[in-house]
Amino acid sequence: MKPVWVIILGWILLVPRVGTAWRGPPEEASFYYGTFPPGFSWGVGSSAYQTEGAWDEDGKGPSIWDAFTHGRKEQVLGGDTADTACDSYYKVQEDIALLKELQVSHYRFSLSWPRLLPTGVRAEQVNKRGIKFYSDFIDALLKSNITPVVTLHHWDLPQMLQVAYGGWQNVSMTRYFSDYADLCFEVFGDRVKHWLTFSDPRTMVEKGYETGLHAPGLRLQGTGLYVAAHHIIKAHAQAWHSYNNTWRSKQHGLVGISLNCDWGEPVDIDNPDDIEAAERYLQFCLGWFANPIYAGDYPQVMKDHIGTKSAEQGLEMSRLPTFSLQEKSYLKGTSDFLGLGHFTTRYITQRKYPSHQGPSYQNDRDLVELVDPNWPEMGSPWLYSVPWGFRRLLNFAQTQYGDPPIYVTESGAPQKLHCTQFCDEWRIQYLKGYINEMLKAIKDGVDIKGYTSWSLLDKFEWEKGYADKYGFYYVEFNVRNKPRYPKASVQYYKEIITASGFPNPQEVESWRLKALETCSINNQMLATEPLLRHMHVASEIVVPTVCALSILTAALMLTLLLRRRG
């Protein structure tokens, strides 16, 4: 039997294949040729902290990620920061030109809360320069016939709120977030019609309050992430009600949330324990946030498992907070659409973790995640290309949450190591497979309105620094003006958008060949023009070196002159 890699709390173990799990789903093996419905929206995404730079300019306040990368350099690969990132704050027109080249119909980006409210509190200070920046950016997008899809909060909480209140551990964040959201609705809502309150809050709380790998870097295992999530869910609902009560009748927009989840497939489809474990995986991942928003409360399996574990650990109350009857009613139905992010798939099997091991999110789930070594590995060790899982997740979301309109808010793959810079054929295959499974899900009856590929640019990738490169456009971070260069996937994605699907085998294959031909030309061009590529780097190195040598020479001459006089 061949081995399977198992991921358990960051450790990698080796176990044999078991049962009947390692099947290739025959109904999903064939490629489907067809087109998407009229009006389907194609886009790309990014976030403020990862791309903007200008971390302390034009009145912006510090975020928790500024504090984290400046104060804990050992926790970010290479000690990198996003102080300048892609310099998108100063390259608006250049980045919009890239969006136009891709021919996308929408662009998903986030607003920086501390750029608009430096302390995080609306009553204390509103940064007019921040408002002007985003207002001008939105206008420029609309002028280019690109619809803005705006995320209010993508992990960069104002540092002042973290210091003063403990961030999302404090229920007061719900009020401050609602005030911030209301400001955004007021000043941008006449032009923005698609809002996302939060982006992937599960990862935000798990890595920020459980493992400490992300800002604010807290390790409150088995408690902190549930408290933070509880407050985030309330904050989302409060922002939705604010829009619904005050702005909807005037602006006619939509407010949702972006929730990321991988698909969980039972290792053995004939084993009830594995089936239950896979369901539990999805509920602890997607249901954790989606269930309160669509049904008013946490999934029953979360309440049961965390409650039982808490009791076994000698606690009088569950570590999972509870909603009051009034809060349940307030939460239910607070989303105009479901934003769904998806990257990969896991096989899931049952495993009972003893309660004496201590509280943790991983132990609460009582399961193990596995991957098939035959799955194509992308550029990051956690991400494998498993397109069929995407279709299954989309169908699950439709059934679980009452057939909501779904916008795919992020999906993509990073660059492989040791690859040709621009010839990202693995990303082309990823796009082809995942978008095709999304098309199949639409044929299944899932109401999918749009797709956002992640991401426009190579950018700062949190604890990975600049190592993981998800962009359609390569960014030369070592050059002062950070030029952008298209990868092969730009041409391929553009063809999918133009055709709105996959017309026939011959045409789809011609797209791939054309894209790879284009990237080869780009690689050759850059290889023959190294001086032009690195002129800025050379100026940054040579000029200071010449100045330093001049100073040293002058100092030496002065020393010799003084000695002669002495």
Curated annotation (Swiss-Prot):
Phenotype of null mutants: No visible phenotype. The lens of the eye appears normal in young animals. However, formation of the lens suture is abnormal with an X-shaped or double-Y shaped morphology instead of a tight Y-shaped pattern. Optics of the lens are distorted and cortical cataracts develop; the phenotype progressively worsens with age. Expression of CLIC5 in the lens epithelium is almost completely absent.
Top-level division of the source organism's lineage: Eukaryota
Cysteine-cysteine disulfides: none
GO BP field: carbohydrate metabolic process; lens morphogenesis in camera-type eye; visual perception
Keywords, sorted A to Z: Endoplasmic reticulum, Glycoprotein, Membrane, Sensory transduction, Signal, Transmembrane, Transmembrane helix, Vision
Molecular function terms from GO: hydrolase activity, hydrolyzing O-glycosyl compounds
Location(s) in or outside the cell: Endoplasmic reticulum membrane
One cellular component term from this protein's GO annotations in UniProt: endoplasmic reticulum membrane
Pfam families given in the database record: Glyco_hydro_1
Tissues where the protein occurs: Strongly expressed in the lens of the eye, where it localizes to the equatorial epithelium and outer layers of newly extending fiber cells (at protein level). May also be expressed in kidney and skin. However, another study suggests that expression is specific to eye and is minimal in other tissues.
Regions that span the bilayer: 541-561
Predominant localisation class: endoplasmic reticulum
Sugar-bearing residue positions: N170, N244
Keyword Endoplasmic reticulum: yes
Residues making up the signal peptide according to the UniProt record: 1-20
Cross-referenced InterPro entries: Glyco_hydro_1, Glyco_hydro_1_N_CS, Glycoside_hydrolase_SF
Quaternary organization: May form dimers.
Similarity section: Belongs to the glycosyl hydrolase 1 family. Klotho subfamily.
Role according to the record: Plays a role in formation of the lens suture in the eye, which is important for normal optical properties of the lens.
Protein name: Lactase-like protein
Species, as recorded: Mus musculus
